[in-house]
Amino acid sequence: GKLQAFLAKMKEIAAQTL
């Protein structure tokens, strides 16, 4: 649910940061 979406968002942001 929301946790999956949150983790996906964090992962996406992390990918953009790196």
UniProtKB/Swiss-Prot annotation:
Recorded GO CC terms: extracellular region
Highest taxon, organism lineage: Eukaryota
Keywords assigned by UniProt, alphabetized: Amidation, Antibiotic, Antimicrobial, Fungicide, Secreted
Gene Ontology BP annotations: defense response to bacterium; defense response to fungus; killing of cells of another organism
Chief place of localization: secreted
Family: Belongs to the cationic peptide 04 (cupiennin) family. 05 subfamily.
Role description: Inhibits growth of Gram-positive (S.aureus, B.subtilis) and Gram-negative (E.coli, P.aeruginosa) bacteria and fungi (C.albicans).
Entry protein name: M-lycotoxin-Ls3a
